[in-house]
Regions:
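Conserved SAM/SAH cofactor-binding pocket of Class I
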Residues: 6-83, 88-91, 97-98
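Conserved Class I SAM-dependent methyltransferase catalytic core
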Residues: 13, 116-173
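Mobile active-site "lid"/loop adjacent to the S-adenosyl-L-methionine
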Residues: 93-119
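Protein kinase catalytic-loop region centered on the HRD/HxD motif
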Residues: 303-311
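C-lobe/activation-segment region of protein kinase-like
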Residues: 329-397
């Protein structure tokens, strides 16, 4: 069990002032933070949890001895047994980088010191009330920049409440709350929001959306779908990138193309998550006939884009722009660079891509006559004859 030290005292000062509502003390140890919260008139029920059985037994004995009310001590690994949402979540995690020769869960937070904190931030929004706050302590030894990166990636915001410097480290206490964006996303019934990937202009998050909450019905059936959330990167200089992509998704969705747009606001858009493999990964796992069918289908989608007079701009190198789903259907994603043009080149660009992956296709017993393909691409560019696409598919041998 972790006995109170300087870090515990520093955090306790803030807990005694700021704890309110339903309180969760994670990694309670001696129970110093839970007891401090209990002493605040603004606090209601206090739940103290720890992975250490001895710590929970000792705290329960203290609760009985003092005949304390409105406090429970439970064994839990982070949020494992912490049900419901909380107005205040307190966490003084083990924050030292792992010492290879010593195993002590009470002081070591992982290889670099921040891994346990990363798990915490990935889960905390599901347990924090919309107006809730996190009181979080960490050390300079943990890497302050990394902690702030984890906070930001999870769409949270922070402010410094207190700090204390020692000869070998500096301690910080942060108040962390949900960002306005996160609160708005959760108000839209998006749950389990997690960072997924970073693009040139946007950041992608995944979430689960309970559509039954969005439609008034007499039936209680829960229909959850996996969704992707795209928000503009804070460091991106692109103007109106969200509005631009929403515009084109509306257009291509009418043709059965692109991920299905669900809803949007000025600074984010939400669409159905496309589960599957990127095109080259998929090709490596498939047979010759399946690959031909997919290439034909993609050329068909490119033809639709050309017919609409729009250019996706990425089809000559669409490694991250085409996903093949589990039922072997190609889906074009990421329309943020799409432009309107009287000279669309989606078909010709994708034919060029086919020529460039000659070795990957050859490994699957599929040969493409590059000279003939490029000749057909030029003919299509000059004439717009859609029959040329059939000839392009037939040029594989």
């Amino acid at each position: 069990m972790y006995e109170p030290r300087e870090d515990s005292i520093l955090l306790e000062k803030q807990v005694s002032k700021l704890a309110f509502g339903r309180v969760l003390d994670l990694g309670t140890g001696s129970g110093i933070q839970a007891l401090a919260a209990l002493g605040n008139h603004d606090a209601g029920e206090v739940i103290a949890v720890d992975i250490d059985d001895e710590a929970i037994i000792a705290l329960n004995d203290l609760i009985k001895l003092r005949k304390l009310r409105k406090i429970k001590a439970l064994r839990s690994n982070l949020f494992e047994n912490a049900d419901g949402k909380f107005n205040t979540i307190i966490f003084n995690p083990p924050y030292l980088p792992q010492d290879k020769n010593i195993e002590d869960k009470a002081i070591y937070g992982g290889k670099h010191g921040w891994e346990l904190s990363e798990q915490f931030f990935n889960q905390v929004s599901q347990h924090l009330a919309a107006d809730g706050r996190i009181l979080f302590l960490f050390s300079s030894l943990t890497n302050r920049a990394k902690i702030e990166e984890l906070i930001n990636l999870n769409l949270l915001q922070f402010r410094l409440l207190g700090q204390q410097k020692f000869s070998f480290e500096e301690l910080y206490v942060y108040e962390i709350t949900k960002s306005d964006l996160l609160r708005r996303l959760e108000a839209r019934q998006l749950e389990q929001i997690h960072y997924f990937a970073k693009g040139q202009r946007g950041m992608i998050y995944t979430a689960w959306l309970d559509q039954s909450k969005l439609v008034k019905t007499h039936f209680a059936a829960k229909k959850q779908i996996k969704a992707a959330i795209k928000i503009k990167r804070p460091d991106s200089k692109a103007q109106q990138s969200i509005e631009h992509e929403v515009h084109w998704l509306k257009i291509v969705n009418k043709q059965g193309l692109g991920p299905k747009l669900l809803f949007y606001e000025e600074d984010f858009l939400v669409y159905e998550f496309v589960e599957g493999l990127f095109i080259l990964e998929w090709i490596k796992l498939q047979d010759r006939s399946s690959i031909i069918l997919i290439l034909k289908s993609i050329l068909g989608q490119c033809l639709i884009l050309d017919t609409l007079g729009i250019n996706k701009e990425e089809m000559h190198h669409p490694l991250k722009h085409i996903i093949i789903t589990k039922d072997n259907k190609p889906a074009l994603i990421d329309f943020e660079r799409t432009v309107e043009t009287n000279k669309p080149k989606n078909v010709t660009q994708f034919i060029e891509f086919i020529c460039r992956i000659e070795e990957e296709l050859k490994a699957k017993g599929l040969k493409a006559d590059k000279a003939r393909l490029r000749e057909l691409a030029k003919e299509y560019k000059d004439s717009g004859d859609q029959q040329i696409i059939k000839e392009a598919v037939n040029s594989f041998y």
